[in-house]
Amino acid sequence: MKNLQASVRDRLLNIAQETNRPFSEILQYYGIERFLYRFGCSKYADKFVLKGALMFTVWQVSERRTTLDIDFLANYNNQVATIEKVIKQICKVPVTPDGLTFDAETVKGQKIKEEMEYEGVRVKFIGLLGRSRIPMQIDVGFGDVVYPRPKIIDYPVILDFPKPHLKGYSPESIVSEKFEAMVKLGLLNSRMKDFYDIWLMMRQFNFNGLHLVEALKRTFKRRKTTLPEDRPFFAEEIYDEKSDRQTLWRAFLRKGDIKIAPERLSDTARKIEEFLMEPLDAIKSNYEFHKVWKKSGVWSTPPGVSL
């Protein structure tokens, strides 16, 4: 086991040097990857859906932001003790040796409440690669609906160990949930990552208009939030270049070493409006939205479709 741990550590160090990333970040991603593998091998794999920024890794999105935790949607009991028990059992799932152990004795959960109607659960625990400690965090949400339905994904691996195999979120529902949170929070919105993630996704994906409209409708209905009908979608501070939100945006870009995004939050917000205005008009007017979003930046009508 010690030889394996040393070998894994050396290979991770090489990756850190080759990619010019901190070793701690590469180690964290390895811990996330191998824990997801254990999750996929467990009896709970069908009850949890991977969401959040880790899906950008699944989709191999370039310029994705760094994330150091795991987000799940669970079709499961939302009691802290119950989720703690699940995580403890997954820590002990027998797998092909990969140099890692997860200490079930360190598992500790607490309730969280963000934009969801139902309380979520945050669980922290420790992974170990030899003497190197990996602080793990999992946020579990409840009560949301995913459209289109979750698909089985193969999570990319850093080293040549088996890939995690589990359920993953749809791009449409990720956009819908982030947009709903941005609308609901209004003046309180300090979640710059949501602006960036939607802006990034609209540049990386083609979207089926019918699917995006349905995802928006279901998410806003489930969370009991009113869909915006007109521009501007967001609080006026988002568009004010002298507001503290602009300061937050610049700090977010600087911390994440993000160089491709607009320098001004207002420009990002207006791009998102261009992306979502037509789907929202379709919902407001109750007509079927057959257009397709091209990642080049326009909604277009597919050949053979008459509107």
Name each region found by the language model.
Residues 1-48, 58-66, 70, 74-307:
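Structured mid-to-C-terminal alpha-helical surface segments
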Residues 50-54:
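Glycine-rich beta-strand-to-loop/alpha-helix junction loops that act as flexible
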